[in-house]
Amino acid sequence: MKTLTCDDYDPNSLTVEVALQRIDRDLQPIVGEEQVAIRSALDRILAENIFSPVNVPPHNKSAMDGYAVLGTDLPTEGKVQLAIVGTSWAGKPYTNPITTGQCARIFTGAVMPIGTDTVIMQEQVERQGEMITLSAGHRIGQHVCLIGEDLQTDQLVLVTGKKLLPADIGLLASLGIPEVKVKRRLRVAFFSTGDELCSLGEVLQPGQIYDSNRYTLYALLNRLGVDMIDMGVVRDNPQAVETALLSAALTSDVIVTSGGVSVGDADYVTETLRRLGEINFWKIAMKPGKPLTFGKIKAVSFFGLPGNPVSAMVTFYQFVQPALQRMMGQNKSTPLQIKVPCVSPLKKRPGRIEFQRGILEPDEQGRLVVRTTGKQGSALLSSMSQANCFIILPIDCGEVTVETEVLVEPFASLI
């Protein structure tokens, strides 16, 4: 990477790290829990530690279709014949003991009969009637899942603050746990501001544009599993802004807006925000997304995002999402970031971190590489739609040449 003079440096800007620290310092997890059935617990935040009430598996079981035998009957050389004395099915075990010279037909998941400790795959025996012949080369204990091998009674299984994923739901079911205690859902009110904005279903008038940010925010918030309060489009006048903010403060834990409110570029908006709460109007040393507003309206956390669509998404991912996750009580996690070669040149001036939109994919040689989506304007929402990652270029970085390694953050790791 070529490092240039910092001609883009703004001495009044906050770094992303400092802004995150200030936000984190002012946040507290919400209070409130509820008991839900595990069918309704997907993507909820666990509010209790889960300990296994049973051993998993609860008994020694076969991992293969085959024959359950005694390890002492395994030949070290040559062959041995064993008599089949019964069958152990999954859910219907064979209950008689197996002794030397005997074996039992067994199926995957079935309980190991008393006396047996080894399973021979059905493809590795010769069967004639009720006798099998097996050769040397097998290991005592092979193809058997032992009692408690996965989980043992009273073992800590899931910790409070974990976001429950599909595998966790299955795990809870395997333990016989029908319900769990989870954090209540975070209530988030959101709206867009601007006289130029038109809601879907309305006819565009001269100078108007469709309100894309509110639908983007809806989708981003929906994936986080919060309770959303969509307050629509708020017009650019002091009374409308104040009414919307006060209404949101009565019904929500967090308010998120996009547009003029975030920048404080209109005097009445700035005064309204400051009169209603404690608000900081920040310039962040980042691109896109330089303006960010954060603070409190009454006792409710407030985030004001830029009006440009890409800027709104980038600031949501980098600031709002981790803040909401903390307030939800979710354990802190760091998004995956990896270094890969960049196969297209990137323009950048030092002075602020940039989150350029990229496409991460294997090249013809199977290498994982990244390329730009093209033009990086903060109003070009199509660049976010085409991308599957951010290309993160640090503050002191200048232009990037082809094959230079860059840091990328896959969108999939942000969810």
What is the meaning of each model-derived region?
Residues M1-E17, P178-L305, P309-T315:
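Helix-rich terminal scaffold detector
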Residues M1-E77, Q330-F355:
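Short, low-complexity N-terminal leaders and the immediately following helix N-cap/first helix
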Residues K2-L14, Y67-D230, R235, V369, ...:
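Short, glycine/charged-enriched hinge/interface segments at domain edges or termini
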Residues N12-L20, E34, I38, N60, ...:
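Generic structural signal for well-ordered, non-membrane alpha-helical segments
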Residues L20, E34-R39, E48, G91, ...:
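Flexible glycine/proline-rich
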Residues D24-V31, N49, M112, Q155, ...:
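Structural signal for hydrophobic packing residues in well-ordered secondary-structure cores
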Residues A41-N55, P93-R105, F294-G295, A299-S301:
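Short, hydrophobic/aliphatic alpha-helical segments
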